[in-house]
Design a protein with these regions (language model features):
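Beta-propeller blade signature
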Residues: 133-136, 188-191, 232-240, 283-286, ...
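Hydrophobic beta-strand positions that form the internal "hydrophobic ladder"
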Residues: 118, 173-174, 218, 269, ...
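Cap/lid segment of the alpha/beta-hydrolase catalytic domain
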Residues: 150-164, 175-182, 196-198, 224, ...
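A flexible loop/linker signature enriched in serine peptidases of the S9 family
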Residues: 123-130, 153-158, 177-186, 201-204, ...
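Active-site-proximal cap/loop segments of hydrolase catalytic domains
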Residues: 515-714
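C-terminal motif of bacterial Sec signal peptides marking the signal peptidase cleavage site
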Residues: 15-18
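Non-catalytic accessory segments flanking enzyme active sites
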Residues: 68-165, 176, 256-309, 343, ...
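Blade-edge beta-strand/turn elements of extracellular beta-propeller
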Residues: 191-203, 240-252, 287-297, 336-346, ...
Length: 714
C-alpha cells in the first residue's frame, strides 16, 4: 500500500511538471563598450564595435581575449536561436527532406561543344558536389572524367571550385579552389593526358585563368590580400614558380577592379578595368603573350563600354553620347578609333541593351523591355532581325553557353515562376526551337497547379513598380493568406522571376510568393538603377514598403501574415524597411545583411569598400555621409516595435563581414520595445554564399521557412 502511495505521488509530480510552462530561453545580452566615431563634426557612439575581429585574429591557432569574447557571443546567439526554434525542429527536418526530395540526385547538365569536345557536369546520388566530364568529337564517344569536386572537398568544412578552363590544345585543365569562403582562390593545373596535378600553384587570385594561344602561357587576376580587390593581371608560364610571374597590368585606382578574358574569335586577350560608372579595355593578340597590352579607348568618367571581336571587326556596347540604355557599335579591327565607330543597334529610351553574343553569321542581343528579358537575333549577312517568341506573361530568358562561332544554333535558357529551368537550342535560320532539357522536379509537382502573374504597384511618387507573384491555384484573394515578399534592389541587378523548387514548400502550405522589382535594379532600364542608388537610394526602401501596402490593399495578404526577405544588399533593404514601417510585417528574414553602411564605407581596408563608393556614395564627403546615415539600418535603430526577425550570417564572409549583422542584432535587442523574436544564426564554417554543398545549404532554407510557417500558424 505504501509503495502504491509513492508511485501515485511520483505520477502526480510528473504530471505537475509536464503542465508547468517551459521557461522562455534567455536572450544573449551583448556587453556595451562605447566607441566614439566622429566625422564631419558629427559624433556617433558604437557600443558594439568590439565585435570586429581581424583576419589574423580569426585565423589564429589560439584565440585571444577579444576573439574568445566574440566567439562566445556568436555561439550564445546560435544556442538561443536553436532554443527559440526547437519546437520547429520536426518541421525543419520535414521541409529539408521535402526540398531535397524534389531534387534529382543523379542528374547532369546538357553538353555543350567547345574546341572539339562536348563538356558537361553530373551530380551523383548522395554527393554534394559535381563531377566534370567531356567527350571527344561526338556525344557517342567515351566520357572522360576531368574533375571530381567531391574528392577535392573530402575532409573540408567548405569547398568552392571555380573557373574551370581548358588550354587551347585541350591538354591542361586549370581551376581555382577556396576552402575558407573568403574568395581567395588558389589556381591549380592538371595534365589531362595523365590525370596528374602539375606542381604549379598560384594563391590569392579570383580563381580563373585566360590562356594564350600557345597553351603554355596563361593570365590571371591577383587580389589585394587585405581588401580582396582584384587589382592586377599576372602572366604565368607553366612549369615555373608563381613568384616569377610577370605583372602585365596593375590597377592604380582603388575604386576600380580588373579582370582578363578573350574575345569570341579567340584572337585577342582583353583586360577590363571597371568601377560602377566607368570602364576601360586593353587588348593584345593571343598569339603574342609577351607583348604589351594597348588601350582600346581611354577611360572617361561615366563612360561604360565592353568589347568583343569576330570577322575582323570589334563590336562595342557603350553608353557614350547619353546612351543611358546603351547602344551597340561596330568598327574594323585595324582602325578602332572612335571616329570609325558605326551604329549597329541604336539607343532606345524604353529598351535596355544588356549584352550580346557573336557568331560568324549572327549577332544575338539580350534586351530588357518592360521588365522582361528578350532575345533578339540579327543576321549579319542580310541585316534582318527578329525576336525569339515566349508565351508566358512573367518569365526569364538568358543567352547560355555558345562557344562555337560557326553555327546556326543558339543555346539559351528559359524559366518562370511556374516553369523549371529549361535549356533550348534555337535554329536562328529556321526559327525552330528544340527543348533539350527541363529540370526535373521529383514528387507530385505539376506546373498546372500554380498561377503566376504580373501586378503594378504605385509608389508614393507615382512610379509604377512591377511585382511578380505566384500562388497555388485555389488561392482566395481575401486578405487572409500568408505571403513572402522578396527583393534585392541594388547594383543594377535585376531579380527576374525564375523557378525555385524550394518555394513550393511555401506555396503548398498556402503562401503566395512575390518579387518586388524595386528601383536600384535594372528591371525597367538603366534609369531604374540610377533612381535607386547614391542620393536616390531611399527610393529602394520606400518602393518595397509601397509594394507591401499595395499587396495588403489588394487583399493578397495582411500585415499579420506578410513576411519579407532579402539578402546581402537585400538585407540592407530589410533593415531599412523595418526601421521605416515595421507595422507592415509579421516577420523578416535578413540574410548576410549589409547593415552598418556608414562605418563600413568609411573604411577602405574592408573588402569592396572603395569599389562601391559609386553605388552608395563616399561618406568622406559630408553630403553623402548624412544621406547614408539617414537610412543605414544599424544607425537608425529606434526605440519602437519591430516584427519578428531572423538574421543569418557567415563567420568567414568577405563581402558582408559577420560583425555587421551581429552588431545590428545586439543593438536591436537593446532598443526594441516589443517581445517579438529576434534571432541570429551564424554559420561558423561558411561565408557570404552559405554552405557550399547542394543539399547542406537547404538546411538554412528550411530554418528560414520554418521560422515563417510557424509565425503564420501553418
Amino acid at each position: 500500500m505504501k509503495r502504491s502511495f509513492y508511485v501515485l505521488t511520483l505520477l502526480i509530480i510528473a504530471s505537475m511538471m509536464s503542465c508547468t510552462p517551459k521557461k522562455k530561453p534567455q536572450a544573449p545580452d551583448a556587453e556595451k563598450k562605447p566607441k566614439e566615431l566622429v566625422n564631419h563634426d558629427h559624433k556617433r557612439v558604437d557600443n558594439y564595435y568590439w565585435m570586429r575581429l581581424s583576419d589574423e585574429q580569426k585565423n589564429a591557432d589560439t584565440p585571444d581575449e577579444q576573439t574568445q569574447e566574440v566567439l562566445d557571443y556568436l555561439n550564445a546567439e546560435n544556442d538561443y536561436t536553436a532554443s527559440m526554434l526547437d519546437h520547429t525542429e520536426k518541421l525543419q527536418e520535414e521541409l529539408f527532406e521535402e526540398m531535397k526530395g524534389r531534387i534529382k540526385e543523379n542528374d547532369e547538365t546538357v553538353p555543350y561543344l567547345d574546341n572539339g569536345y562536348y563538356y558537361f557536369s553530373r551530380y551523383l546520388e548522395g554527393k554534394e558536389y559535381p563531377l566534370y566530364y567531356r567527350k571527344k568529337g561526338t556525344l557517342a564517344a567515351e566520357e572522360e572524367l576531368l574533375l571530381d569536386v567531391n574528392k577535392i572537398a573530402e575532409g573540408k568544412d567548405y569547398c568552392s571550385v571555380t573557373g574551370l578552363s581548358i588550354s587551347p590544345d585541350n591538354n591542361i585543365l586549370a581551376y581555382g579552389t577556396d576552402f575558407v569562403s573568403r574568395r581567395r582562390y588558389t589556381i591549380r593545373f592538371m595534365d589531362l593526358n595523365t590525370g596528374e596535378m602539375l606542381p604549379d600553384a598560384i594563391e590569392n587570385t579570383t580563381g580563373r585563368v585566360t590562356w594564350a594561344a600557345d597553351s603554355k602561357t596563361c593570365f590571371y587576376t591577383g587580389k589585394n590580400f587585405e581588401t580582396l580587390r582584384a587589382e592586377k593581371i599576372m602572366r604565368h608560364d607553366l612549369g615555373t614558380e608563381s613568384e616569377d610571374d610577370v605583372q602585365v597590368y596593375f590597377e592604380k585606382d582603388e575604386e576600380f577592379t580588373c579582370n582578363i578574358g578573350k574575345t569570341k574569335s579567340e584572337k585577342f586577350l582583353v583586360i577590363f578595368s571597371s568601377q560602377t560608372l566607368t570602364t576601360e579595355a586593353r587588348i593584345l593578340e593571343a598569339d603574342n603573350p609577351d607583348g604589351d597590352f594597348r588601350v582600346f579607348v581611354p577611360r572617361e568618367v561615366k563612360h561604360e563600354y565592353s568589347i568583343d571581336h569576330i570577322n575582323d571587326k570589334f563590336f562595342i556596347r557603350t553608353n557614350s553620347d547619353d546612351a543611358v540604355n546603351f547602344k551597340l557599335m561596330v568598327t574594323p579591327e585595324n582602325d578602332y578609333d572612335r571616329d570609325n565607330w558605326e551604329v549597329f543597334i541604336p539607343h532606345r529610351d524604353d529598351v535596355l541593351l544588356q549584352g550580346y553574343t557573336l557568331f560568324n553569321d549572327y549577332l544575338v542581343a539580350s534586351e530588357r523591355i518592360n521588365a522582361l528579358n528578350n532575345i533578339r537575333v540579327f543576321n549579319l549577312n542580310t541585316g534582318e532581325d527578329h525576336y525569339v517568341d515566349f508565351d508566358e506573361e512573367v518569365y526569364s530568358s538568358r543567352i547560355s553557353v555558345n562557344e562555337v562561332a560557326d553555327s546556326d544554333a543558339l543555346r539559351y535558357t528559359y524559366t518562370s515562376l511556374t516553369t523549371p529551368r529549361s535549356v533550348f537550342d534555337y535554329n536562328m535560320k529556321s526559327r525552330e526551337k528544340e527543348l533539350l532539357k527541363e529540370t526535373e522536379v521529383l514528387g507530385d509537382f505539376s506546373k498546372d497547379n500554380y498561377q503566376a502573374k504580373r501586378l503594378w504597384a504605385t509608389a508614393d511618387d507615382g512610379t509604377e513598380i512591377p511585382v511578380s507573384l505566384v500562388y497555388r491555384k485555389g488561392f482566395e484573394r481575401n486578405g487572409k493568406s500568408p505571403m513572402l515578399l522578396y527583393a534585392y534592389g541594388s547594383y543594377g541587378y535585376s531579380r527576374d522571376p525564375s523557378f525555385n523548387s524550394s518555394v513550393l514548400s511555401l506555396l503548398d502550405r498556402g503562401f503566395t510568393y512575390a518579387i518586388a522589382h524595386i528601383r536600384g535594379g535594372s528591371e525597367m532600364g538603366r534609369q531604374w538603377y540610377e533612381d535607386g542608388k547614391l542620393l536616390n537610394k531611399m527610393n529602394t526602401f520606400t518602393d518595397f514598403n509601397d509594394c507591401a501596402e499595395f499587396l495588403i490593399e489588394e487583399n493578397y495578404t495582411n500585415p499579420d501574415k506578410l513576411f519579407a526577405m532579402g539578402g546581402s544588399a537585400g538585407g540592407l533593404l530589410m533593415g531599412a524597411v523595418v526601421n521605416l514601417q515595421p507595422e507592415l510585417y509579421k516577420g523578416v528574414v535578413a540574410a548576410v545583411p549589409f547593415v552598418d553602411v556608414v562605418t563600413t564605407m568609411l573604411d577602405p581596408s574592408i573588402p569592396l569598400t572603395t569599389f562601391e563608393w559609386d553605388e552608395w556614395g563616399d561618406p568622406r564627403e559630408e553630403e553623402y555621409y548624412h544621406y547614408m546615415l539617414s537610412y543605414s539600418p544599424y544607425d537608425q535603430v529606434k526605440k519602437q516595435n519591430y516584427p519578428n526577425i531572423l538574421v543569418t550570417t557567415g563567420f568567414w564572409d568577405s563581402q558582408v563581414q559577420y560583425w555587421e549583422p551581429a552588431k545590428w542584432v545586439a543593438k536591436l535587442r537593446d532598443m526594441k520595445a516589443d517581445d517579438n523574436m529576434l534571432l541570429l544564426k551564424t554559420n561558423m564554417k561558411a561565408g557570404h554564399g552559405g554552405a557550399s554543398g547542394r543539399f547542406e545549404r537547404l538546411r538554412t532554407t528550411a530554418l528560414e521557412y520554418a521560422f515563417m510557417l510557424d509565425l503564420a500558424g501553418k
